[in-house]
Amino acid sequence: MSLHRVTVVRVVVPVIIAASGAVALAQAAPASVAASAAAGSAGSSSAAKAKPVYFHTLPPGAKLPSGATCARLVNATPEGEVKAANRPYNRRKGQSVGRHFFSAGDSPLAQKRIAPLITGDFTGTTIDILRWAACKWGIDQDMVFAQAAVESWWQQDTLGDWGTDAAACPPGHKLGQDGKPGECPQSYGILQNRYPYEDGGWPAMINSTAMNADAAYGIWRACFDGYETWLNTVPRGAQYHAGDAWGCVGRWFAGRWRTPAALGYIAKVKQYLREKIWLKPYFRQLG
């Protein structure tokens, strides 16, 4: 769930249990690593044997790889689908988020440097879409896997943050239309992007898994690079600053910086990371 200035109680369908673990910050493997791995030895099926590149967190202000570069790295060692219901959403690309995606309380650099890169321009399996987003925005891929499990169990059709405010309902999702009389969901998709704060990404946020993940981690990067200065103008548990990867994970849920709600969410994501919940047999939904 993406919150810019408001803390709300979230209700997510389906209900998810907690979260992940600590991840070291490191430089992502260069394209040459994937290229040499994919090349392999002559006459062999190298793509099947190549070890996938692991995408690590890149420091604030780092030069990030392009979406096209990340697509090549991911597609060099593609991984299978574990969420069959996502296939229609995984086949759809995203859209531009427009000129006013980030709030006026953010540094103008967020809109200038981050927003134009949010496009959802990728298709693939669910895990490959998450790998692509991790690569593109320079965040440790296991953090992404764990957070997406907390938010939606990796299910793009997840609906959350139900409310009664008709103005907060996206087009096509009027009050009562999605199964709860007098309510509509405000958060959608694999990362539970929230319509009132990210309306520039609609309707692709709902229809495209790649768009949902791309926007979520574009916002994470804006936070990590120090652009979300409004976090120091609202109640907080500490002073917001650049470079706190986990603080920016907690901000996604709580809309505040290292408050009790944010810390509780961070603990959930870290639990799933420790467990590597996405590798468990019961996590797979193949049909």
For every predicted segment, state its role:
Residues 2-4, 10, 14, 140, ...:
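Poly-acidic low-complexity segments
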Residues 129-131, 136-175, 193, 216, ...:
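Short, functionally critical alpha-helical segments immediately adjacent to catalytic or ligand/cofactor-binding
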